[in-house]
Amino acid sequence: MSSTNHFTYLVLGAGSGGIASARRAAKHLNAKGNGDRIGIVEVTRPGGTCVNVGCVPKKVMWNTSFIKEMINAAPSYGFDFGGQQVKFNWPTIKKARDEYIKRLNGIYDSNLAKDNIVRINGYGRFSGPKEIQVNGANGEKYTADHILIAAGGRPTVPDVPGKELGITSDGFFELEDLPKSTLVVGAGYIAVELAGVLHSLGSETTMVIRQKQFLRTFDEMLHTTLLKQMTDDGVKFVTEASIKSLERDVDGKRIIATTNAGVKLPPVECVIWAIGRVPNTDDLGIDKAGIQLTEQSGFIKVDEFQNTNVPGVHAVGDICGNFLLTPVAIAAGRRLSERLFNGKSDLKFEYENVATVVFSHPPIGTVGLTEQEAITKYGTENIKCYNTSFINMFYSVQVHKVRTSMKLVCLGKEEKVIGLHIIGDGCDEIIQGFAVAVKMGCTKWDLDNTCAIHPTSAEELVTMV
């Protein structure tokens, strides 16, 4: 094997976790000046799901829908458009959004080059326990002292007749115009977010969910509040149903979905599959490396330090299946590099009290245990919950109202806050600071002992009784 084909650290996948780990490794290895080499293998644009077809472009579209809601609220605040209707142009924001993503791709490439990280263009697969072959059986082979698998995941598409008539969340970002009507199939945060954006921008939106509720792993207060708000806002729901087939209508322009009960739903212009994601482990040559996968979902099995069962092979991010969140992949990747290349042998990412946000309408912020999880873990007698629900002051002069609801889940006599769940305008920003408090072990008294900022929604979290 040529010395140019051997690396100290070789990363498979230039997504958020892979790049973060590679750059942190470069920081330490480059400083040592021992000639250590770092490489990263990627077949497409750098940035992974988050930058290209996930968090970043999604947030741009959420911002777009937020502006639309502000326009709707403007007359209540005395703004007169002179009888003119404000028009929304989807191609304009799509062009601006796509250009922004390309700039980010360029920044990632530039940062990799600055850190002397070798970019290997192509699709990498294991050809042995510590060997990666790029671009097929006749492709170049690379070895490394340490290999990181950070190849991410992809949307799931059900195996039903006509499945190709639907698109995934990836395809959402390829839409050239706003569909007049959309059917979103799924009950997770991706389904909820896309349905909210499309409805706010003017697409007649229906959600199909297998059970009575969506966001079922979230606290009951959150999904109950959101379901009512989305229903009040005009989103339609088909519950306790799944899609058995898709077909074109008679004119070929719209799509008709048939449920498992044999009910044909009204035709729509667009169907989005948002039923979950699977790890990209099926075409990585995992068997040739002897890497173990989880039995149920095929994620890469790792220990608390992100090690696989093969010495010198590690994994982070969505491909591990533990919190499919960009900040988690970044944090785990950086800690891995600190452990491998900076002597911090005990450093690891702690998968507890990870805060998360759903960019729904209104947004959700949550950290810690749900009420039911807390009761299951500690017993009903040891849990006390504090709740509040109110109309944000922003809606005081509007006919349209959006409710804000908050819950604190507290443990024991000292009332340690082990869960904090909020939904309402601004909750996507509010949650970060309170997540720090929960991570530090704050109690209800710590919140009570904090002077409120008035008038805000956040003050309710420090004034609950």
UniProtKB/Swiss-Prot annotation:
Xref: InterPro entries: FAD/NAD-bd_sf, FAD/NAD-binding_dom, FAD/NAD-linked_Rdtase_dimer_sf, Glutathione_Rdtase_euk/bac, GSHR/TRXR-like, Pyr_nuc-diS_OxRdtase, Pyr_nucl-diS_OxRdtase_dimer, Pyr_OxRdtase_I_AS
UniProt EC number: 1.8.1.7
Binding-site positions, FAD: S16, G17, E42, T49, C50, K58, G124, D318, T326, H454
Biological function: Catalyzes the reduction of glutathione disulfide (GSSG) to reduced glutathione (GSH). Constitutes the major mechanism to maintain a high GSH:GSSG ratio in the cytosol. The amount of GSH may affect the determination of cell fate.
Cofactor: FAD
Pfam families, per the entry: Pyr_redox_2 (PF07992), Pyr_redox_dim (PF02852)
Protein's name according to its UniProt entry: Glutathione reductase
Location relative to the cell: Cytoplasm
Amino acids binding NADP(+): A187, I190, E193, R210, R216, G276, L324, V357
Residue numbers annotated as active site: H454 (proton acceptor)
GO molecular-function term, one example from the UniProt record: glutathione binding
Gene Ontology CC terms: cytosol; mitochondrion
Domain of life: Eukaryota
Other comments on record: The active site is a redox-active disulfide bond.
Positions that bind glutathione: S16, R23, Y108, R334
Family, similarity comment: Belongs to the class-I pyridine nucleotide-disulfide oxidoreductase family.
Organism of this sequence: Dictyostelium discoideum
